């Protein structure tokens, strides 16, 4: 009987292949039959024969979700728009752009009308802003940071790292209830691809650095820069830079717009993990499901393609 592999098992397969170990040895290490490893590698390797554990796990998750949900296409366009709004939490503009790529025409204005016409308020609850908008003024203050040895200012970052080049990343932490739990978030700026993981040790700097290096290691050839804020949890940035052969740059204080990709991504995450949540009560599978959902959300900047599709196009 075929057993579903875990993320950890797929990562072990990836490392075993890198170390040129046999499939039999890898299978013995992770406790599965050799045929399971053989099938996994054959099924999820790219055209060049390279196996990427991250891609493999996302494909497996999507196959499981497709088999679990009803895939019947609604007869009416409004029903399909409603499904995408409620089921995927996409914005009206994302729904309109995505359906247009599929040859179905509906304006985002009409979808907003549908939301306003819904007396129950259910559709409104799936909009990120709940149909309420606030204008924020950007402020800038002088940066004086003394808690990060060897800090490299964002003003030293290459001009090419402006958000259009592939391989420039941003990172941040989302902190849970009582500052007792944290989730690390990483975002590739040009494609908005998200990687996130809960930190069992919270904001402990060494654990943060080790997790960043581990999560980005499979993509290390495409990690040209990393930009973050001045949180003390990132004080071991040299450890990250050494592991990935890159440079970590720090934004100015009170200038969150200097790392806008990760800030906007964190707001999307808050749709599923609201402020005041104790992350210790969330399963790793749930956190990964949030990552999957955000990465398959179409973006206007990508011509309504998805971060997942565009990221792996350039990777493969």
Predicted regions: what they are:
Residues 221-236, 254:
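Acidic/histidine-rich, metal-coordinating catalytic segments
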Residues 181-183:
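Short loop/turn microsegments at loop-to-beta-strand junctions
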Residues 166-176:
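Two-metal-ion RNase H-like nuclease active-site motif
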Residues 13, 37, 81, 95, ...:
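Mobile genetic element proteins and their domesticated derivatives, centered on retroelements
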Residues 1-89, 93, 97-98:
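Short, basic alpha-helical/linker "hinge" immediately adjacent to a nucleic-acid-recognition surface
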Residues 31, 75, 79-87, 241-248, ...:
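Charged alpha-helix within mobile-element recombinases
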Residues 175-179, 196-220:
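Active-site beta-loop-alpha junctions of metal-dependent nucleic acid enzymes
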Residues 55-59, 63, 106-161:
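Basic, flexible linker segments flanking DNA-binding modules
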